[in-house]
UniProtKB/Swiss-Prot annotation:
Keywords of the record: 4Fe-4S, Cytoplasm, Iron, Iron-sulfur, Metal-binding, S-adenosyl-L-methionine, Transferase
Cofactor note as given: Binds 2 [4Fe-4S] clusters. One cluster is coordinated with 3 cysteines and an exchangeable S-adenosyl-L-methionine.
The protein's name: Ribosomal protein uS12 methylthiotransferase RimO
Function: Catalyzes the methylthiolation of an aspartic acid residue of ribosomal protein uS12.
Sections of the chain in a coiled coil: none
Residue stretches making up the MTTase N-terminal domain: 3-119
GO molecular function, one term: aspartic acid methylthiotransferase activity
Gene expressing this chain: rimO
Originating organism: Anaeromyxobacter sp. (strain K)
Residue stretches making up the TRAM domain: 373-441
Homology family: Belongs to the methylthiotransferase family. RimO subfamily.
Length: 469
């Protein structure tokens, strides 16, 4: 019988892709993938080491899964990822129950190390690995959606960020290799590609021939079967007009852009080495809104950066009120050892960070409610995920401006659709993050397919839906 392996992934979508590559490598080597750690002889934990809370979550997961070595079938526990790249020796001392620690440059070696009784316990080479279309990969999301990692590493030197030390410098994948992987995913049923990298807009700057992101996007849009292409982690420093035009003019690129801006205070932008000032950021946002009507912007902000005064924070609060982002996440600054920001004076107390985060979110929640209410009565395309987790009487899906895993859902309370099908939905109700609607149109070829009955939502109920309360 094949040895069973379970993968536990923490952190960002880029980490998910790394886990999928390791799963593919293990599956190709003959391992059987399972969803229950209690059934696995081998457990792999792919960690995050970006900020303190992520490190704590990773260690807790390792300790919890180590119980399977004492109580379950597990005979080998492997820990990989950013936390290992950063703290391998310390982890090895503190966690004797772990058999192997693999850094971010060793993902391709996981099957060899797991199967070799003589393999080293610590395998932490330079972080220079980047997978290709020829690398085995198992998509861990529902088959209709997948992440496509177009580059690895980062050449920026943001004062608060440890990622370049964990992931190495920018390494872009060639266009033909990315198109080949996109085509392979489409052949498995993928209709939505979410493009990810540490710095998406830096794509190609390290490749010969002056290749950039706006050259890649039209090629991906030609892949048969791909309906939606979504852009994440777009660094704002370099967004040329050609890229804006590609997003505006190509129908398969959804009008959604995830662009972490971090702050609006010029003083803090300089201190954090972001490379652009607030005038540039405002001009960029205005250019994007003007050139791409209906664009949904998601951003991430940091409160409590070293030296952030009340005046700096008020500037950020006004910026959020002014820009009215469709989606927004706020992080409390975490002082990371080895970064310039950790050595700066005037560190902000944790209580102040929390209070500032809460104030930003209170403002954003009102903005989100207004955006959501404006959706009522509109007809939008929705990618159906399947039955809602909350109740079998609803279907759950996402419209083009709802990204997987991080944004809200569109619940369907009237109509029929298959998972992976894109249907037209009329929005009838809205909450802070989620929407409700009814199916008003389907692709005739899908509606007539001789398959088992598609999931059907229950008719709309008067008085709204409990799932939105």
């Amino acid at each position: 019988m094949a040895t069973r392996v379970y993968m536990h992934t923490l952190g960002c979508p880029k980490n998910r892709v790394d886990s999928e590559v390791m799963l593919g490598t293990l599956a190709e080597a003959g391992y059987r993938l399972v969803q229950d750690p209690a059934q696995a002889e081998v457990i792999v934990v792919n960690t995050c080491g970006f900020i303190e809370s992520a490190k704590e979550e990773s260690v807790e997961a390792i300790v919890e899964l180590a119980d399977q070595k004492r109580e379950g079938r597990c005979r080998k526990l492997v820990v990989t990822g950013c936390l290992v790249q950063r703290h391998a020796e310390e982890l090895a001392r503190e966690l004797p129950e772990v058999d192997h620690f693999l850094g971010t440059g060793a993902y391709q070696d996981v099957a060899r190390i797991v199967s070799d009784a003589q393999a080293k316990r610590l395998v932490v080479p330079d972080p220079d690995f980047v997978h290709s279309s020829a690398t085995p990969r198992v998509n861990s999301l529902p088959s209709h959606t997948a992440y496509l990692k177009i580059a690895e590493g980062c050449d920026n030197a943001c004062a608060f960020c440890i990622i370049p030390k964990l992931r190495g410098g920018q390494r872009s994948r060639p266009i033909d290799d990315l198109v080949a992987e996109a085509a392979a995913l489409a052949a498995q049923g993928t209709v939505e590609l979410s493009l990810v990298a540490q710095d998406l807009t830096a794509y190609g700057q390290d490749l010969p021939g002056k290749v950039r992101l706006h050259h890649l996007l039209p090629e991906l849009a030609k892949v048969d079967g791909i309906r939606w292409i979504r852009l994440h982690y777009a660094y704002p420093r370099d967004v040329p007009d050609a890229l804006v035009a590609a997003i505006a003019d190509e129908p398969r690129i959804v009008k959604y852009l995830d662009m972490p801006l971090q702050h609006s205070s010029d003083r803090l932008l300089r201190a954090m080495k972001r490379g652009r000032d607030s005038v540039f950021l405002r001009d960029l946002l205005a250019r994007l809104r003007s050139r791409i009507p209906g664009l949904a912007l998601r951003t991430a902000l940091i409160v409590g950066l070293p030296g952030e005064t009340e005046a700096d924070f008020e500037d950020l609060l006004r910026f959020v009120e002014e820009q009215r982002f469709e989606r927004l996440g706020v992080f409390e600054y975490s002082a990371e050892e080895g970064t310039p920001a950790a050595e700066m004076a005037d560190q902000v107390p944790d209580a102040v960070k929390r209070e500032r985060r809460d104030r930003i979110m209170a403002v954003q929640q009102a903005i989100s409610r207004a955006h959501q209410q404006a959706m009522i009565g509109r007809r939008v395309e929705v990618l159906v995920e399947g039955r809602a987790e909350e109740t079998e009487h609803l279907l759950a899906g996402r419209h083009a401006q709802q990204a997987p895993e991080i944004d809200g859902l569109t619940y369907i309370n009237d109509g029929v659709a298959y998972p992976g099908e894109i249907v037209t939905v009329e929005i009838t109700d809205a909450a802070e993050y989620d929407l409700v609607g009814r199916v008003v149109a389907r692709d005739p070829s899908r509606a007539a397919r001789p398959l088992p009955a598609a999931p059907r939502a229950a008719p709309a109920r008067k008085g709204g839906l409990n799932v939105l309360r």
